[in-house]
């Protein structure tokens, strides 16, 4: 049995999340509340929302937790060549927070193999847009020829970044945005990006699962660090990857 949270109720301890043998490993609580304040409290405790349309807000603390360390971002020989073309071609841009809400809509509406529907409802868009206005949520956008062709969004607290979703309307467009984000965060001393749940795609990019206890210990320290300001960069940060020795 999971807890139902009224608006002012605290989250239960994360060790009360459903275990690996349950139908929903990591499920901790449910609520009707997706306020910006509730989201900030959740992220500081290593908890994230994820639910289907028509369900209450479901709160999760998975064990293990999928993370991506910026220095572990995987750059193949082919993708390194792509990044060099992006750097050399002025029609390619990386924009930050230029169209935050539109990025969320793109993440919600872009078709994905094996996925039907989206959890990024209008209520979710409104909640994260409110976080964006307060300086906590950011988008990293790949533009080509004046068109937004890929991107991602997430939440930044101190020296912690919590990735939420990404989309691509062109091959590698979201991966280019992630490469830029990893280069920027790595240069600012950010050691970990929360990717929430393990997938083959995230693993192919360098993500790896870590025990929940280790993840939470890192979050407690990193999320309380001073905020990264200014939150701004451009495609020049991609040189971090094109200058490195090639990886398989």
Curated annotation (Swiss-Prot):
User: Domain of life here?
Assistant: Bacteria
Entry-linked InterPro entries: Acyl_CoA_acyltransferase, Leu/Phe-tRNA_Trfase, Leu/Phe-tRNA_Trfase_C, Leu/Phe-tRNA_Trfase_N
EC class of the enzyme, as a word: transferase
Q: What is the annotated localization of this protein?
A: Cytoplasm
Reactions the enzyme catalyzes: N-terminal L-lysyl-[protein] + L-leucyl-tRNA(Leu) = N-terminal L-leucyl-L-lysyl-[protein] + tRNA(Leu) + H(+); N-terminal L-arginyl-[protein] + L-leucyl-tRNA(Leu) = N-terminal L-leucyl-L-arginyl-[protein] + tRNA(Leu) + H(+); L-phenylalanyl-tRNA(Phe) + an N-terminal L-alpha-aminoacyl-[protein] = an N-terminal L-phenylalanyl-L-alpha-aminoacyl-[protein] + tRNA(Phe)
State the UniProt keywords alphabetically.
Acyltransferase, Cytoplasm, Transferase
| A Gene Ontology term for the protein's cellular component | cytoplasm
Q: Report the main location listed first in the record.
A: cytoplasm
Q: What is its EC number?
A: 2.3.2.6
In the record, the note on similarity to other proteins reads: Belongs to the L/F-transferase family.
| NCBIfam families, alphabetized | aat
Q: What is this protein called?
A: Leucyl/phenylalanyl-tRNA--protein transferase
């Amino acid at each position: 049995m999971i807890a139902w949270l009224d608006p002012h109720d605290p989250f239960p301890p994360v060790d009360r999340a459903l275990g690996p043998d349950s139908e929903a490993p990591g499920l901790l609580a449910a609520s009707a509340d997706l306020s910006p304040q509730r989201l900030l409290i959740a992220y500081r405790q290593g908890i994230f929302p994820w639910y289907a349309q028509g369900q209450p807000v479901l709160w999760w603390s998975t064990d293990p937790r999928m993370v991506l360390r910026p220095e572990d971002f995987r750059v193949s020989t082919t993708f390194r060549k792509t990044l060099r073309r992006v750097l050399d071609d002025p029609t390619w841009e990386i924009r930050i927070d230029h169209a935050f809400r539109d990025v969320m809509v793109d993440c919600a509406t872009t078709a994905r193999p094996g996925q039907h529907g989206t959890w990024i409802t209008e209520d979710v868009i409104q909640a994260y847009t409110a976080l964006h206005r307060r300086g906590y949520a950011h988008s990293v956008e790949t533009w080509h020829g004046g068109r937004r062709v890929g991107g991602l969004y997430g939440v930044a607290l101190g020296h912690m970044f919590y990735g939420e979703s990404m989309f691509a309307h062109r091959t590698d467009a979201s991966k280019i945005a992630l490469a830029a984000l990893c280069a920027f965060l790595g240069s600012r001393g950010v050691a970990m990006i929360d990717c929430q749940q393990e997938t083959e795609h995230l693993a192919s990019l360098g993500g790896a699962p870590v025990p929940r206890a280790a993840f939470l210990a890192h979050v407690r320290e990193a999320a309380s660090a001073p905020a990264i300001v200014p939150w701004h960069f451009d495609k020049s940060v991609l040189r971090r990857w094109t200058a490195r020795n090639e990886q398989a």
